[in-house]
């Protein structure tokens, strides 16, 4: 399960757009993923991370969360082959002299090989257990809940991390299962004002309607 950012991965060639999962594309500040039917608009003055920076952040984050737990680190690394980082954007440039740099991430992880994961709640159940097992002391201020975004049900998990006695970072994980992938948004903030800015990005999202599931006679 994804605890930090996923790895950037490219799509296949020789297929029509939308037939196979890929990392999507940016058109200015608009992100599109035809396979998932996902479109969203990012603030023009926010800072999109390049694939190399994302991958470096992934490796660092995995080591911090896993600590000395080699089994957890190995599991995270194994999941990278099935994970695509679609969007990673910060409000300020990396290294800016600010108290906290709000971050918006969108990740897709293949789960078609895991028949027990049918909903975002199933996915986040395992993600929460992994967070609880990490060396970092996450707390969960409320139970997981369901929220409808762009006409689609997402399960939401809120996790908090006290970096200092007076500094609390909140991560909101919003997940749904779509065409064999968990579509996961991660909003990271330290104030309600920052949360509102991240939620405003999320509210630009549209998701194309999926064809009805096939029924067996």
Each model region followed by its residue ranges:
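N-terminal targeting sequences that direct proteins away from the cytosol to non-cytosolic compartments
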Residues: 8-100, 112, 132-153, 163-169, ...
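Bacterial N-terminal signal peptides
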Residues: 1-8
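Extracytoplasmic/secreted proteins, especially bacterial periplasmic and envelope-associated proteins
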Residues: 41, 106, 122, 126, ...
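Extracellular C-type lectin-like domains
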Residues: 172-174
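Nucleotide and nucleotide-moiety/phosphate-recognizing core
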Residues: 157
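Mid-length scaffold segments of soluble, non-membrane domains
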Residues: 108-122, 127-140
């Amino acid at each position: 399960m994804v605890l930090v950012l996923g790895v950037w991965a490219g799509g296949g060639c020789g297929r029509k757009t939308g037939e196979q999962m890929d990392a999507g594309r940016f058109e200015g500040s608009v992100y599109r993923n035809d396979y998932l039917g996902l479109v969203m608009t990012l603030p023009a003055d926010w800072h999109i991370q390049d694939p190399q920076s994302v991958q470096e952040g992934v490796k660092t984050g995995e080591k911090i969360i896993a600590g000395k737990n080699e089994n957890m680190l190995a599991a995270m690394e194994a999941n990278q082959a099935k994970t695509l980082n679609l969007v990673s954007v910060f409000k300020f440039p990396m290294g800016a002299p600010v108290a906290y740099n709000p971050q918006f991430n969108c990740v897709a992880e293949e789960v078609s090989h895991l028949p027990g994961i049918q909903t975002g709640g199933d996915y986040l159940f395992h993600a929460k257990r992994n967070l609880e097992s990490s060396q970092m002391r996450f707390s969960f201020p409320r139970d997981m809940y369901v929220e409808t975004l762009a006409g689609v049900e997402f399960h939401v998990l809120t996790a908090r991390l006290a970096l200092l006695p007076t500094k609390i970072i909140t991560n909101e994980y919003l997940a749904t299962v779509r065409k064999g992938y968990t579509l996961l948004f991660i909003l990271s903030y330290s104030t309600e004002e920052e949360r509102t800015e991240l939620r405003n990005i999320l509210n630009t999202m549209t998701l194309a309607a999926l064809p009805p599931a096939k029924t067996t006679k």
